[in-house]
Swiss-Prot record:
GO function terms (MF aspect): nuclear export signal receptor activity; small GTPase binding
Domain Importin N-terminal, residue spans: 31-97
Lineage: Eukaryota, Metazoa, Chordata, Craniata, Vertebrata
Compartments where found: Nucleus; Cytoplasm
GO process annotations (BP): protein export from nucleus
Protein name per UniProt: Exportin-6-A
CC terms in the record's Gene Ontology section: cytoplasm; nucleus
Family: Belongs to the exportin family.
Sorted UniProt keywords: Cytoplasm, Nucleus, Protein transport, Transport
SMART domains: IBN_N
Gene: xpo6-a
SUPFAM superfamilies: ARM repeat (SSF48371)
Organism name: Xenopus laevis
Pfam families to which the protein is assigned, alphabetical: IBN_N, Xpo1
Length: 1135
């Protein structure tokens, strides 16, 4: 090697060149290779130590530390003991001497490298590692440095990465736990000393004008006078350096709390100190523009930067954020030892004192203005605390006499409804939802105490209901609600407004469950008020010839109307959301309320359809027209929500006095025909269609087809001259009309169902719907493009409607399915005839196969064996290897979808319990394994694979006797592994395909196929079968272990471990004595002694938890040994 000085200059030059904008990628790769080779040389660390002590180049310093890091984590095993000792002595000295001059990120990296040494050698060879950290903290000049070391040690030693053997990980955690009491005492001392030092100099404040209110609440929340006094002291004025030390100490505590168990080491003194700092977030007087990060390390030990003598308010707020992080780490622990219950109460009491401080009003500040001054991160942390308290600990605290829950709810109410941000408000609503769930579950478990429980909380629930309802109404909250986006969809397909409304209505619904009478009367009163405005609009209509105009023109009137319409739309959604609370056991008790709602909704829907407000000219069309459309759509949707109530109502009055029910249904149906039109906005059209579907499917009144308005809809759909509706509306309407004719009427004897008449009507309906499609009979594939596209459109539209009709009656009785098949039999046969002609048109083929899939799933019996066999044979003949390849390999996904649909049909076929389809099994297996599997086996894309493997699984699962014919009795008397087998070659090929799939990268296929094997084992003892046990099981176990070792499917560690256990449990003795040694013998990259250690550490225990723990230990340690061995220089001797 060259001299150290020359090497340093060369390295600096290379680094400058590497990071220069003009350096090519090829040259960068050359430099990278050169640097890697240098790092692998024996003794390179000495040069790197020289570079660290002499260079001012950040790139050089970072590279030098990375050499040390790589050596310690990967090559330490082969480093001579004397050199290790030199490194252990020299690096801490370097850190101590230069930490004030080094850039902060370099200093942090150096700390990490030293901790890595401790991770390897403490306490045996580096006995003073942790002692040195404690000494650094105790020395004022190095306290920040010691805290960085401590936090790094907690991060790297308590939860180490994969590059340590399991035994060492366990040892490190145990060693650290032994140090926890000392560390916590030390950190408590650091924080207390700084707080006390600066509190002495803090001025005594004048008495607060609201002091008496504060004291009253404190006396309820905190029953310890000294604690009350401590928390009421004014906050200290910290120096900048002291603020940094406190921030680091709190970061250390936060990380420690994330992994140490709750115990007496977390003393009342420490908790009080943390809360002292948490107060600082409440007292902040300036709001940060950027969110605070909890990693303050970067700014702590940077000696190059100068700091003001006193920390600004935002830095004090940061301490409040960090302190709340500590508290939340404690709160998220669900397992609370009995001896820690008192501490938990103390934590809650102290935090609610802070909640009171946040929500108090003074002469100078309203609650909202106080919130706007607080740091956003602090408010988020505080909301997290409240969520954890309610979801995890409320059940522990509620019954404690020292905890005033009602006062807490008062503070939570103020906290919720003064949130400065929408996200903050919605997070608080989630907390209330959790509280309401808690109350509901408590009442269900103690029904005899229902009145007492609700009585205790009734006032709070009433306040909450009123405020939530006000918050969703433009009348009270227009400015904030107008800001919500109602156009852009998020990942859940909701707009901002829809998400806000949904959150709010969920809370309203939960209150309705607890206070049904009050909630309903409050909501219905608000609905009535806005309905009166809407229904009164007919007085403002001005007619001009055939056109009508809404004569509301004054700006203020338009604004008020806009607010009222938006509120009516929201309240209609609320009423629909509450429909579930009027059915079931509550039907009788709440009947009158529900009837009032339904009658009002029917009135509103008919009113909207009659005067066609959605088509009116308005003074502000961009605002009022969407409002009017939405109100009408929501009234239809709200009425649809009551379809289950209507069904129950129908069953109650069907035999006596049905007049009122008939009137409701007839009036509701009268609102639909004007909306079934291409001229009506699609939102309204679809709402009308959905309502008709619900009435036809859920309510099923036997008089529905006799209603003139329903007959109008029937005529509209079957009229060939009428313009076709949009596809979704057309499908929904056809479904509704088909269901009217096919679904049995409730509570009507079979002999009175009028099946003959309904069958005739259904046949006419489908004849009308398939008129154009049936004209294709006998025709060939059109050659002209325009004609071909028109024909394809007819096929796809018709089969789409027919498929939907079939899918919707697939679970119904035999008679409904018989009538359905009779009506579409001609179309089904025509589809099979046309199929070969359109085999190369992927979109048409997919629609045809979807239709046949629906037939197989819903009408298989009605089709009869000859026709189903004809369909299967046609498909098997058409899907040759060439056709499969063409479909799968074509651009886009349409071709793959065709093959997937075909495989889904075969899945239905192989699950058929009878004997009719058994002759097809050899052909299906041949198609799968000889024609399809070779095409997709090596393709990285998961397309088709999932469906193919599901088909293979279903074939094995439902046709096990195709391979194992012996009877159940014979299996019982014979050893299960010795059953005679048939079709062995096909079975082996299928199992090999499953095994091959575990070598592929797709995790979904892996998970699916692993679960299939486990199911076959649990149902058919697959792993115990002689063929599998002797010829396949070792390979499967080996592949699964290799997958774990290579970490290619880490998300499935648990599932893989269980599968390995189930395979090994077939014969544990063979696994331990034969498989494990052979597996380790075949493992590359390990020496003989390491293999022996791995075998010795694998405990021969046969219960699932112990076995899987041994598997994961084996995998972890094997990976670690390989990592070390791969990084050792050639010729290394390991002792």
């Amino acid at each position: 090697m060259a001299s150290e000085e020359a090497s340093l200059r060369a390295l600096e030059s290379l680094m400058s060149e590497f990071f220069h904008n003009g350096t090519s990628n090829e040259r960068k790769r050359e430099i990278e290779s050169l640097l890697n080779n240098f790092a692998q040389q024996l003794g390179a660390w000495r040069f790197c130590f020289y570079f660290l002590s002499q260079s001012q180049n950040d790139y050089v310093l970072m590279y030098s530390l990375s050499v040390f890091e790589n050596m310690i984590n990967k090559m330490w095993l082969g480093v001579p003991s004397q050199e290790k000792m030199e490194i252990r002595n020299s690096l801490p000295k370097l850190l101590l001497s230069q930490h004030k001059s080094l850039p902060s990120f370099i200093c942090n990296k150096l700390c990490k490298v030293i901790v890595d040494m401790g991770r390897q050698d403490w306490p045996m060879f580096y006995h003073d590692f942790f002692t040195n950290i404690l000494q650094l903290i105790q020395t004022p000049s190095t306290t920040p440095l010691g805290l960085i070391m401590l936090k790094t040690a907690s991060e790297e030693l308590a939860c180490p990465r994969e590059d340590l053997i399991v035994a060492r990980k366990e040892e490190l955690r145990k060693l650290l736990l032994e140090q926890v009491p000392t560390v916590l005492d030390l950190l408590t001392g650091v924080l207390e000393s700084i707080w006390d030092k600066h509190s002495i100099t803090a001025a005594t404040p004048p008495p607060s004008p609201t002091a008496s209110d504060t004291d009253d609440l404190l006396s309820n929340l905190i029953h310890t006078p000294n604690l009350t006094k401590q928390l009421s002291q004014p906050p200290p004025s910290l120096e900048a350096e002291s603020e940094r030390v406190c921030a680091l100490a709190l970061e250390c505590l936060s990380h420690l709390f994330s992994w140490i168990p709750l115990s007496a080491s977390i003393t009342p003194s420490l908790l009080t100190t943390i809360f002292q700092f948490a107060r600082l977030g409440c007292d902040a007087r300036s709001r940060q523009t950027n969110s605070v990060t909890t990693n303050t390390t970067a700014s702590v030990v940077n000696g190059r930067s100068s700091s003001p003598p006193t920390a600004p308010a935002r830095d004090l707020a940061r301490l409040g954020v960090l302190a709340m992080s500590c508290i939340n780490e404690l709160m998220c622990k669900n397992c609370v030892p009995l001896e820690f219950q008192e501490y938990l109460l103390r934590v809650c009491q102290q935090t609610f004192y802070l909640l009171q401080r946040i929500t108090r009003e003074t002469n100078a500040h309203s609650v909202r203005s106080r919130f706007e001054e607080l740091d956003e991160s602090y408010v988020e942390k505080f909301t997290d605390f409240l969520r954890l308290f309610v979801s995890v600990h409320l059940r522990r605290i509620e019954s404690n006499a020292q905890f005033p829950l009602l006062e807490f709810l008062t503070l939570l109410f103020k906290y919720t409804f003064h949130q400065p941000t929408r996200e903050g408000y919605l997070s608080c609503l989630d907390i209330w939802a959790q509280f309401l769930d808690y109350l509901t579950n408590k009442i269900r478990n103690r029904l005899e105490d229902r009145d007492a429980i609700i009585g205790r909380y009734e006032d709070a629930l009433v306040l909450l209901l009123n405020e939530v309802l006000n918050r969703i109404q433009f009348r009270y909250n227009q400015t904030q609600l107008e800001e919500l986006d109602d156009e852009t969809l998020d990942d859940d397909q909701q707009t901002e407004w829809q998400r806000y409304l949904r959150h709010s209505l969920e809370v309203v619904a939960k209150i309705m469950d607890l206070l049904p009478t009050h909630a309903f009367s409050k909501l219905f009163a608000a609905l009535q008020e806005n309905l009166n405005v809407y229904l009164g609009l007919q007085r403002c209509l001005v007619t001009n010839g055939n056109d009508q105009r809404l004569n509301v023109t004054a700006e203020n009137d338009c604004r008020r109307l806009h607010c009222s319409l938006r509120d009516l739309s929201s309240l209609l959604q609320a009423v629909g959301r509450l429909a579930e609370y009027f059915i079931g056991d509550m039907f009788g008790a709440r009947f009158n309320d529900a009837l009032t709602v339904v009658e009002r909704l029917v009135e509103v829907t008919l009113y909207g359809s009659r005067i066609k407000l959605y088509n009116m000219e308005t003074a502000v069309p961009s605002v009022l027209k969407p409002d009017l459309i939405d109100v009408h759509a929501q009234s239809l949707a709200a009425l649809q929500a009551y379809s289950h109530w209507l069904a129950r109502y129908y069953s109650e009055v069907q035999r006596q006095n049905p007049e009122q029910f008939i009137s409701i249904i007839s009036t509701a149906m009268e609102a639909l025909p004007p909306l079934i039109s291409t001229k009506v906005q699609e939102k309204l059209l679809l709402s009308a269609c959905h309502l008709l579907v619900s009435i036809a499917t859920t309510v099923r009144p036997m008089f529905l087809l006799n209603i003139p308005s329903v007959q109008k809809v029937f005529s509209r759909v079957t009229d060939s001259s009428a313009q076709r509706l949009p596809e979704e509306a057309q499908v929904l309407l056809c479904r509704a009309l088909s269901n009217v004719l096919l679904l049995p009427w409730p509570n009507v004897p079979e002999g009175e169902q009028q099946w003959a008449e309904r069958s005739s009507h259904h046949s006419n309906l489908l004849n009308a719907l398939t008129r154009d499609y049936r004209l294709l009979k006998g025709s060939s594939l059109p050659q002209r493009k325009g004609q071909l596209e028109a024909t394809k459109r007819v096929i796809c539209q018709t089969l789409g409607v027919l498929r939907d009709i079939v899918e919707n009656i697939s679970g119904e009785g035999t008679k409904s399915r018989q009538i359905c098949y009779q009506s579409l039999q001609e179309s089904a046969q025509l589809s099979l005839t046309l199929f070969p002609a359109y085999i190369h048109q992927s979109d048409v083929t997919e629609e045809m196969l979807s239709f046949f899939l629906a037939l197989f799933q819903g009408l298989r019996v009605q089709m009869g064996a000859p026709f189903t066999e004809q369909i299967i044979q046609t498909f098997l003949n058409m899907f040759t290897r060439e056709q499969l390849a063409e479909s799968i390999l074509q651009e886009g996904s349409a071709g793959c979808h065709v093959v997937e649909k075909f495989l889904k049909i075969l899945q239905v076929v192989v699950q058929e319990p009878g004997q009719s389809f058994k002759p097809f099994l050899p052909s299906i297996l041949s198609l799968c394994m000889e024609q399809l599997y070779p095409i997709i086996a090596e393709r990285p894309s998961p397309d088709v694979k999932a469906e193919l493997f599901e088909l293979l699984f279903q074939l094995l699962h439902h046709n096990w006797r195709y391979f194992y014919r012996s009877s159940v009795l014979a299996s019982v008397h014979r050893d299960g592994s010795d059953e005679p087998m048939e079709n062995q070659a096909q079975f082996i090929v299928v199992m090999q395909a499953f095994g091959q799939s575990f070598l592929q990268p797709d995790i979904h296929i892996f998970r699916q196929n692993l679960s299939y094997l486990e199911t076959l084992n649990s149902k058919h003892k697959l792993y115990h079968k002689k063929l599998f046990q002797t010829g396949m099981l070792p390979q499967f176990v080996s592949v699964l272990l290799q997958v774990l070792i290579h970490k290619s499917h880490d998300l499935l560690q648990e599932e893989i471990g269980i599968a390995v256990y189930n395979m090994a449990s077939v014969d544990f003795s063979t696994f331990f004595s034969t498989f494990l040694p052979e597996f380790l013998t075949g493992c590359q990259g390990l020496d003989t002694s390491q293999k022996s250690v791995l075998a010795r550490n694998f405990k021969m225990e046969r219960d699932l938890p112990s076995f899987t723990q041994s598997v994961h230990r084996l995998v972890n340690d094997l990976r670690y040994y390989r990592l070390c061995n791969d990084s050792l220089p050639p010729g290394t001797v390991k002792l």
